[in-house]
Amino acid sequence: MKRPAIIVPEDLGGKVLLHACCAPCSSAIVEWLVQHDIRPTIFYYNPNIFPFEEYEIRKNESKRHAESLGLSWIDGDYNHEQWRQDVCGLEGEPERGRRCEQCFTLRLTVAARKAKELGIKYFTTTLASSRWKSLEQIERAGHIAEQMVNGQCSMGNGVVFWAQNWRKGGLYERRNQLLKEFDFYNQQYCGCEFSKR
């Protein structure tokens, strides 16, 4: 029997905190979640994006998308200088290198904290929809974030990272259709100044 492309955790409970990197990457995931009676709270936390004007464009597109669907959208704030300190020494790493994994871990840890604060058990990320990103790095980062927020002894009561390949099930193709339908701004680089090389 063929395994379904999207595996929904049995105890999801109809809600998830979705860390969103941008509107284009979020669009098909959000559509799929809503169609399957899962209400995402969209959490926009991307201090890696540079310059600030680029960050504002992407943030506003993400917010516009969520508002058009009547979904909760949370601004995770922007502190690029702190992000630079957190990836210090990794500036020369290639895309999909150690800098990216550190960046994912930082962002997903903040997302996990937000999920815990809101009482949402599961969190996931749109980063896993990009063909330019390593799914293995994203999954590791999500599980590290889960452990950092829960501590060693969560006894099953903590937040859980929903590791999902959001490229599957036709979602990547649907993303490209929704990009045109919503007339989203579509960036040409991941976000940080080092990814522009």
Where are these regions (language model features)?
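Nucleotide-activated chemistry modules centered on ATP-dependent adenylation/adenylyltransferase
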Residues: 1-197
